[in-house]
């Protein structure tokens, strides 16, 4: 078995590699892993983690070896590594949460549990579903609408002097809420077609996204089903009331939308989802596991048990 760590040193607020490299070596020694079976690499450019993961699984495949690859960074780094490794059936991918956003792991456990490197090295492997979209694969959540607009707008405000991440996020929210919030969408869910004026549509494999929004509190990553949440057009005053409920995951319980929100939020279990603006000349901002941009559509389908995830031993034992 080979153990391969890919560290994104610019994820989060400081260079985590200075802490992680010696800690990884210490944990590997404690777990009896030989130096020859351990590789540690640092990324140095966008998408580098994906390239390094492809290289690692290619080398393992040549020797017909099992390999565990750990992505140290945020959800973006994890997605790059996972999609780079998912086509090799003897590869499994773990996540060390050292980024500014680590929503994916919340579907399984806590940041502290996933930061325990020894427990990660002793962990178990769980097969999970993936979402296939026109913009690539996602493990967690894809969306279109207000939430994606906010995330897409953050970099613009970060370029303003003395405007940090938190302030940029707040300014982007204000800009989106004061602009055109809803889009008339054509939605196709497993062949069932309808139109809605919606502020957002979330297509969920995992439960959390957007820095802690619990969009799909009962979603399972291994059930072959996407949990689709459609939030219909509402006034700014109602958004202020509904948003905290949606963030806390209190819009959904026992397999259905709670009665007080059933005219605002709709839920659909799905295998495939296709969303596009009714106006063919209009685009929608699309989010695929945190990567956002304008597009003509969001097309998503579930790919059952298509990736292998490493869970820390304590987390894995609780799952079994």
Residues covered by each model-derived region:
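Short Gly/Thr/Asp-enriched flexible loops that form oxyanion-binding sites at enzyme active sites
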Residues: 77-89
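Glycine-rich beta-strand-to-loop/alpha-helix junction loops that act as flexible
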Residues: 9, 72-74, 98
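Glycine-rich phosphate/pyrophosphate-binding beta-alpha loops
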Residues: 143, 147, 202-216, 292
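Short hydrophobic segments within beta-strands
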Residues: 6-8, 96, 231
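ATP/nucleoside-binding phosphotransfer catalytic cores, i.e., glycine-rich phosphate-binding loops
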Residues: 189-190, 220, 230-320
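Gly/Ser/Thr-rich active-site loops/lids in small-molecule metabolic enzymes
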Residues: 158-168, 212, 217-240
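Catalytic core of DAGKc-family lipid kinases
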Residues: 43, 87-199
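ATP/NTP phosphate-donor binding region
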Residues: 1-69, 115, 316, 320
């Amino acid at each position: 078995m080979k153990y391969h760590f890919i560290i994104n040193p610019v994820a989060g607020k400081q260079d985590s590699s200075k802490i992680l490299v010696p800690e990884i070596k210490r944990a590997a020694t404690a777990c009896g892993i030989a130096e020859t079976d351990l590789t540690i690499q640092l990324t140095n450019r966008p998408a580098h983690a994906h390239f390094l993961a492809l290289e690692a699984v290619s080398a393992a495949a040549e020797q017909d070896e099992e390999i565990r690859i750990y992505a140290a960074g945020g959800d973006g780094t994890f997605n790059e590594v996972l999609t780079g490794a998912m086509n090799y059936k003897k590869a499994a991918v773990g996540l060390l949460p050292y980024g500014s956003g680590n929503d994916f792991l919340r579907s399984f456990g806590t940041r502290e549990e996933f930061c325990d490197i020894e427990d990660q090295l002793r962990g178990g492997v769980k097969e999970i579903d993936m979402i296939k979209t026109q913009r690539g694969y996602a493990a967690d959540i894809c969306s279109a609408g207000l939430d994606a607009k906010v995330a897409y707008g953050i970099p613009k405000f970060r370029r303003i002097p003395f405007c940090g991440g938190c302030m940029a996020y707040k300014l982007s929210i204000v800009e989106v809420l004061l602009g055109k919030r809803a889009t008339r969408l054509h939605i196709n869910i497993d062949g069932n077609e309808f139109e809605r004026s919606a502020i957002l549509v979330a297509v969920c494999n995992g439960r959390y996204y957007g820095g802690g929004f619990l969009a799909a509190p009962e979603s399972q990553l291994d059930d072959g089903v996407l949990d689709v949440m459609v939030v219909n057009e509402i006034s700014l005053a109602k958004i202020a009331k509904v948003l905290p409920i949606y963030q806390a995951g209190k819009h959904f319980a026992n397999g259905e939308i709670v009665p007080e929100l059933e005219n605002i939020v709709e839920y659909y279990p799905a295998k495939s989802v296709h969303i596009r603006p009714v106006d063919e000349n209009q685009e929608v901002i699309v989010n695929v596991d945190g990567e956002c941009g304008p597009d003509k559509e969001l097309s998503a389908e579930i790919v059952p048990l298509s990736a292998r995830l490493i869970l820390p031993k304590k987390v894995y034992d609780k799952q079994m």
